[in-house]
């Protein structure tokens, strides 16, 4: 187990998460007593208690007053906030994890972008209006793409879509910085923003879902061609 965290709390958190992931503490099992666990990890009981509370909030553990702390099946109890952690824990599964994230993004984007164009076409035009002026770089496009999709999500009238995009932000933008290093991906995105603005201007909301899905397929094809070169540190925030 290689743990990169510098602070005692960070070390304890990574130790516990990796132990759960590697089935040292499998789902359904009980964690050792607080004193034993703090000695095992090498942190104070106060630090350990803070870490356990944080992991419980993220769905990794269930803490019950007067009872031992139980390890959860995190797939069933955690939220989008653990995506980056999962990507870091299992690099070999990163391509599949990202495929799943992109599929979800395309499916929900088809819904919320159609709703945004139908209900607030002028707002949609404003959201994509500055896209042609974006700096021609991977970082700039990754930030722009996230901001556009998030703004469209909040423009649809259902803020839950926006909250989903908030939850995807970390992994979304890191993947975006790698994906948009491809000039073809940047050109495709600009064409998408432009056409979306045209559909909003002409109030053609009924054509949006197919258009977004088509964009998802085209961008997915580019992404699949880049998967073999995914940097190992993509999920750590250094890519």
Swiss-Prot record:
DNA-binding region: 34-53
InterPro entries linked to this entry: FA-response_TF_FadR, FadR_C, TF_FadR/GntR_C, Tscrpt_reg_HTH_GntR, WH-like_DNA-bd_sf, WH_DNA-bd_sf
Keywords on record: Activator, Cytoplasm, DNA-binding, Fatty acid metabolism, Lipid metabolism, Repressor, Transcription, Transcription regulation
PROSITE patterns in the record: HTH_GNTR
GO CC term, one of those recorded: cytoplasm
One of the record's GO molecular function terms: DNA binding
UniProt domain HTH gntR-type: residue ranges: 6-74
Cellular localisation: Cytoplasm
Pfam families in UniProt: FadR_C, GntR
HAMAP family for this protein: HTH_FadR
Functional description taken from the UniProt entry: Multifunctional regulator of fatty acid metabolism.
Subunit structure comment from the entry: Homodimer.
Name used for this protein in its record: Fatty acid metabolism regulator protein
Source organism of the structure: Edwardsiella ictaluri (strain 93-146)
Taxonomic lineage: Bacteria, Pseudomonadati, Pseudomonadota, Gammaproteobacteria, Enterobacterales
Gene: fadR
